[in-house]
């Protein structure tokens, strides 16, 4: 078989087999090559000559094969065949040698196979390969000596077969320790026919071309040989590097890792808090015009508050204090120059307003709808402004402050009222001639005198009405007629004792709402009645004589007296 070592056979057996092959040749003429047919009737003399040439050719072929193997090993030190079954691809016009011309000897008699089981225990595969190569050389030499030579063609075929045996042995030596080596006895006739048929292929392919193809296939199947590349284009160091083994980490490295993890966790928490704060805040508004497709709610425009510069409205009867001149212009335009054209539709109201929003705000006061509830005391209000002012009572906040005296208050109206006190010359034109206190109205001055200076009030009344007699019992009534009351001999009307008071004749008795005040004036008595009337005269337990006056005589009005009576405390 090709690729296996053959044992030498004795010359007698070879001659017998050659004779049998010659006898069987005429039976199958189509399978024998023309050279063998022509050489059959040549006789014993020609066969002896051929055998002598064969011996010399076989020896030369063995030497050439050894030289070729050494040269190939030197050129390709790493070359090996992956598997013995790998063969070069068949040429389309060429058939395999075994299938082309089966010899008649194969049909009659199969070669003997000697299978030896070889166990390698401690030997290296390379050493085994060298031993096999050394043992193969004398076997090939003996085979070549026993066979007749047919020329240079047979030497080429022996070289190729020797190469196959080397490849199979090298592959077997690398597979494992347990190897099976099969040897067969050589058949000379079969080898001769095979050699003759190699050169009669229908495609006309020579043995040199076949050897080149085999070498190319073997090189392609083997690993890429090492080549010195000056440009280092084929060098890939990352493939040759081995993965570094993981080193044991020390305690310091673990501590650093833990610190890094803690820092990362803290950073994550801080970022989450920042995101929450950003979510609470309003998103920044985009610049540019608003798209028609944009249906997001519009945010109210915010104007920057100007710096505080208090100014006062100089319009007659106003005196409103404003925080900036710009606000003053707005105030004058809408509060003094603009006409009131919006009328309240409520039947009992009819108030006029300059702006529609003022009318809508006022219309809520005519309803009982209170949508704004205090969270502290659950009190309800009709407007958010009233609720905000009320909430300051619970919080104790007083945002407004007077720049002159530091007075604080919650509402702007309170501050405006307070600021008028600092401008007494312009606003407080009426003053008390006794103490010098100033008032906005004249009636307030009269009420002040009746409360704080009653003796002056009575003296003025006596001076203005001295000796005048009032005979009308209904002084403040609607009947203007004077009625004559029963009187004593002097003609003075007899009046009942006012409030049943009895005092000494040296005191002036004033009574108002059950509160009495006395003033020493000899025998005369002045009494301020509960209905607002004044009695001046002398009174005793036996009878009373005097003058009954109305408060209008003193220049005061009943409105002032009523306002003064409602006020609590001095």
Swiss-Prot record:
GO terms for molecular function: ubiquitin-protein transferase activity; zinc ion binding. Its EC number is 2.3.2.27. InterPro entries: Zinc_finger_trans_reg, Znf_C2H2_sf, Znf_C2H2_type. Its main location: nucleus. PROSITE patterns: ZINC_FINGER_C2H2_1, ZINC_FINGER_C2H2_2. Expressed ubiquitously, particularly at high level in testis. Isoform 2 is testis specific. GO terms for cellular component: nucleolus; nucleoplasm; nucleus. Residues 94-104 have a biased composition (Polar residues). Keywords: Metal-binding, Nucleus, Phosphoprotein, Repeat, Transferase, Ubl conjugation pathway, Zinc, Zinc-finger. Residues 1-12, 119-128, 224-245, 252-269 have a biased composition (Basic and acidic residues). Changing residue 344 to A: Abolishes ubiquitination of MAP3K14/NIK. Pathway: Protein modification; protein ubiquitination. Residues 207-223, 270-282 have a biased composition (Acidic residues). Residues 1-306 are annotated as: Disordered. It is found in: Nucleus. GO terms for biological process: activation of NF-kappaB-inducing kinase activity; protein K63-linked ubiquitination; regulation of transcription by RNA polymerase II. Residues 31-43, 59-68 have a biased composition (Low complexity). SMART domains: ZnF_C2H2 (SM00355). It catalyses: S-ubiquitinyl-[E2 ubiquitin-conjugating enzyme]-L-cysteine + [acceptor protein]-L-lysine = [E2 ubiquitin-conjugating enzyme]-L-cysteine + N(6)-ubiquitinyl-[acceptor protein]-L-lysine. Residues 338-368 are annotated as: Interaction with MAP3K14/NIK. Belongs to the krueppel C2H2-type zinc-finger protein family. Interacts with MAP3K14/NIK. In contrast to other E3 ubiquitin-protein ligase, does not contain any domain (RING-type zinc finger or HECT domain) known to mediate E3 ligase activity. This is E3 ubiquitin-protein ligase ZFP91. It comes from Homo sapiens (Human).
